[in-house]
């Protein structure tokens, strides 16, 4: 395999890209390397003018694998494995106010499942959340930046 980030990075970047966009002001990679020199765990942090995002992925590490989106008036949680989620909750400051969403997704594919998840989350049926060429270019650029920072050939 090529390491945690090259194997799993697109999965963890997609929800952040769809929710916060490409207009980050700073990013930072931190990795733990295995004996073979490849990353076994990588954390990617984005700084946006209005938000922070922390993404983690790992091969050879154990984690719960849930998606947590925190905001000023509440948070959204999709339990593991979040990339296959058919259920998520929106929690508000008032602990008794919890919105629960569930649906059965048709077909396979992470990008379609996340797209449907975001469509439901935002309350519209637009196709704006489908994986676009620009999304793919953004994620490929971040992969390239990671490889350069790791001293690996592109």
How would you describe each model-predicted region?
Residues 101-115, 131:
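Active-site loop of classical SDR/Rossmann-like NAD(P)-dependent oxidoreductases
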Residues 12-85, 114-124:
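Contiguous beta-strand/loop segments that form the cofactor/metal-binding neighborhood of enzyme cores
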């Amino acid at each position: 395999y090529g390491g945690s980030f090259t194997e799993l990075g697109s999965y963890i970047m997609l929800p952040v890209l769809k929710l916060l966009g490409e207009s980050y002001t700073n990013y930072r990679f931190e990795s733990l390397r295995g004996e073979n020199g490849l990353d076994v765990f990588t954390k990617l942090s984005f700084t946006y003018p209005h938000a922070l995002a922390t993404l983690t992925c790992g091969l050879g590490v154990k984690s719960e694998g849930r998606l947590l989106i925190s905001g000023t008036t509440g948070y959204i949680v999709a339990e593991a494995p979040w990339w296959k989620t058919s259920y998520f909750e929106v929690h508000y400051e008032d602990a008794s106010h919890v919105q629960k969403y569930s649906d059965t997704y048709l077909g396979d594919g992470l990008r379609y499942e996340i797209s449907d998840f975001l469509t439901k989350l935002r309350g519209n049926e637009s196709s704006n959340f489908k994986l676009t060429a620009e999304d793919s270019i953004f994620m490929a650029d971040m992969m390239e930046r990671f490889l350069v920072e790791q001293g690996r050939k592109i």
